[in-house]
Amino acid sequence: MSKIIGIDLGTTNSCIAIMDGNKARVLENSEGDRTTPSIIAYTNDNEILIGKPAKRQSITNPKNTLFAIKRLIGRKFTDNEVQRDIKIMPYKIIQSENGDAWINIKNKKLAPPQISAEILKKMKKTAEDYLGESIQEAVITVPAYFNDAQRQATKDAGRIAGLKVKRIINEPTAAALAYGLDKGKGNKTIAVYDLGGGTFDISIIEIDDVDKEKTFEVLATNGDTHLGGEDFDNRLINYLVEDFKKDQGTDLRNDSLAMQRLKESAEKAKIELSSTQQTDVNLPYITADSTGPKHLNIKVTRSKLESLVEDLITRSIEPLKIALKDAKLSISDIDDVILVGGQTRMPMVQKKVAEFFKKEPRKDVNPDEAVAVGAAVQGGVLSGEVKDVLLLDVTPLSLGIETMGGVMTTLISKNTTIPTKHSQIFSTAEDNQTAVTIHVLQGERKRSIDNKSLGQFNLDGIQPAPRGMAQIEVTFDIDSDGILHVSAKDKNTGKEQKITIKASSGLNETEIKKMILDAEQNSESDQKFEELVKVRNQGDQISHSTKKQLKDLEKTINVNDQKEINEALNKLDTALKGENKTKIEEKIQEVLKISTKLIEKNKPKQTSESSNSNSPSSSKPEENVVDAEFEEVKDQKK
């Protein structure tokens, strides 16, 4: 069986590893480096350069040199992150026909997966050159907080590169595999802090080591898909631009060539300041005006850099707290802290992480290579080369559908081990409804509008029946890659509709943080809203069934009794439109009291059959059946 290679497709750098016997080996590329810059350049000779050759010519070809493409993959053009990147990227980001963020290079429109595929092709060739055989299969890593669209786009990139992606695994989990097989002995609980070039993840992972069989179980994960080394670089670049503008009166932002030189120098200065207290950013002839050439020479201290990025590092701390809480662990339960991603080499990052966990992070795990090594290990597991290893990963956010009253009903909770499958029976909201709309959501809030919409689809051909009688089985199935498949089936007719969720936009930092943090901060208001909707649904159900009973008994009930029950129903309907839960409950009790009295009064006049069919219990939906706010889909004939 041919090798399944492991690829860390990074924002700033990428890395490839293979299993060599029982050890993972990181491979050197054609330039002799163990990591490859995730940079692609399109030259005037229509040549495509990848990695270091692309980086070398970036200063003279800024508009056709692409970097940090991972920040755009699976995102919509209108996303806040994309709009921020448009202002700072030298290349042209455009809106595609489906609303995604694409790149325009020399009047040619390219999708992010197409561009990422060029990097994957280089990784593939590196492995083929080393092994002397064709490579067809790979395990590719993604940030733990990547959503369905971003994971799917990564798989697409692999397919474009000629690879069958056997598994998509989360970067922190891959790092844990690398650590666990090499360094970890015995049972341990570890925290993997992964701050890369464009994304941040934290995962709490339990490693069980029993008779040399190791199980890696992810207990919780959290993160930010738009926080990384690129943001640190941009803070330093902005400082240098403003300092130069104040000193020379010239804004370098209008000069793409100057900005590309500045970006390269800022990145170099940032790296140098991890091992020295001060560095010079020296760029002679950075620009020129009517007075002649201008030179940039600015001293930057480590303290200055730290002051520029301190809030970015602080932003990474809140997800640590949430991940620990979700894992139901305290700081003292963490045995080891693993740092992954090049940005974790910054002393201030290491210091903040050590302060939080009250222990020094391990220094014996290579932050640039651990993820690729873990991907290779997983490849070895899938090919049978690696025995006695079981990986249990999780889904980062809850998944569900919109149900009656605008509530999100969760089918799969966040941090559920994947792959997983869950089904639940829902029903119709209207009499004789023949179609329903399934609205799929992702997030932690109770109200549908506060969560991320992943898509929707229709199930039609439902057999007409009174509301609450139809049985629609909705099934959520998350595969090993974390990609969601949804199906809806009418249990009466057997009709079924299936989709794979492929949302065209990613979950941005604001949305993700808002989903989880708001759920924590607004748990009380969420609970009140949930209780109000529950009472509303109860009132709506009672109003509907009582009106139905009233219609059946209209010939036997006298005018005064009809007037009394109609007044009570009108008051209930008015209360249902308001926000007062207590008032709705009062009006429900009034309707129940009057309707019970009328049914008892008119009981002798009914046949036992009609009595059974009109009893309050018969109109109630089955237990465990959730009322869903499904609207009938009607043909719009013109």
Swiss-Prot record:
InterPro entries assigned to the protein according to its UniProt record, in alphabetical order: ATPase_NBD, Chaperone_DnaK, Heat_shock_70_CS, HSP70_C_sf, HSP70_peptide-bd_sf, Hsp_70_fam
Organism: Buchnera aphidicola subsp. Baizongia pistaciae (strain Bp)
Chain positions covered by the region annotation Disordered: 598-638
Pfam families associated with the record: HSP70
Regions of compositional bias (Low complexity) in chain numbering: 608-619
Family: Belongs to the heat shock protein 70 family.
Induction (UniProt): By stress conditions e.g. heat shock.
Modified residues (Phosphothreonine): 199
Superkingdom, natural source: Bacteria
Protein name stated in the entry: Chaperone protein DnaK
An example molecular function term from Gene Ontology annotations: ATP binding
Keywords: ATP-binding, Chaperone, Nucleotide-binding, Phosphoprotein, Stress response
PROSITE patterns: HSP70_1, HSP70_2, HSP70_3
Free-text function comment from the UniProt entry: Acts as a chaperone.
